[in-house]
Amino acid sequence: MSSLEIIVDKILKFLEKQPKPEGRPFILGISGPQGSGKSTLASALDTELTRKNESVVKFSLDDFYLTHAEQVELAKNNPNNPLVQHRGLAGTHDVTFLNNVLNAFVKGSDEEVSIPFYDKSKFGGYGDRGDESQWKKANPKTTTYVIFEGWMVGFEPLDSCMLSVRARSTRWQNIEGSLLWVNRKLADYQPIFQKIDSLVELEAQEINYVYRWRLQQEHALKARIHKGMSDEEVIEFVNHYMPQYVFYLGTLSNKVHLNPHCLEIILDENRYPVVMH
């Protein structure tokens, strides 16, 4: 079996043991760093659950980025915060929109829900929300599984004093104020993450594996469409996220490890699962 097949098999068996809510879909969260295989895993689970006659709706945290105009305004209003000059971190998503969509599924609404998608190719790679005519439509009442994936799904804000102390002992001490801003915004995501019934965490055995994984992704993309970021740009891109991993992953992993409704999958450098529990 491939690494993906092993992981999918483990998750399907895990899901069989989880209590299912009545009158609404089961909401499965998938969290993992860039390049860990979240989207590929979500698609594979979608396929396998559909084969079992489940009705599946799949979407990503990325689908709920602010519109291009909103992101430009956010960056303009926070010129001294390098962490929000581009999409990615907490504060750059439409949390109200996302919360409303998940609320519809949690309530088992019989009204059709529209789920956006984000077109990262727009505005020269700066990105914008895709045309509404291409949004996904779903009926929460007839949906049995929602798969919601994202790199920071499940992250919890730290005490601001604790974050300041930790930031000052790292190479990110010069952006302490920016880190605190993002940390405050992370609180807005908690009502969203609390709607998840079970969380699967894809965890890198060594967080620096993310650089290699993201480079592999970009090389594959460039081979397919003949455009993309240089290696230097990819490294800078990952650098943007690295303080978030360093400050928040420990808390998430501890929470997942102790929760019987969560599944921790630790990956080696080749994305092979070395621990699944």
UniProtKB/Swiss-Prot annotation:
Pfam families: Zeta_toxin (PF06414). Keywords: ATP-binding, Cytoplasm, Kinase, Meiosis, Nucleotide-binding, Nucleus, Transferase. GO terms for biological process: meiotic cell cycle. Gene3D superfamilies: P-loop containing nucleotide triphosphate hydrolases (3.40.50.300). InterPro entries: P-loop_NTPase, Zeta_toxin_domain. One of its GO terms (cellular component) is nucleus. ATP binds at residues 32-39. Disulfide bonds: none annotated. Its EC number is 2.7.-.-. Has a role in meiosis. Belongs to the GLYK kinase family. PANTHER family: URIDINE KINASE. This is Uncharacterized kinase mug58. The lineage of its organism: Eukaryota, Fungi, Dikarya, Ascomycota, Taphrinomycotina.
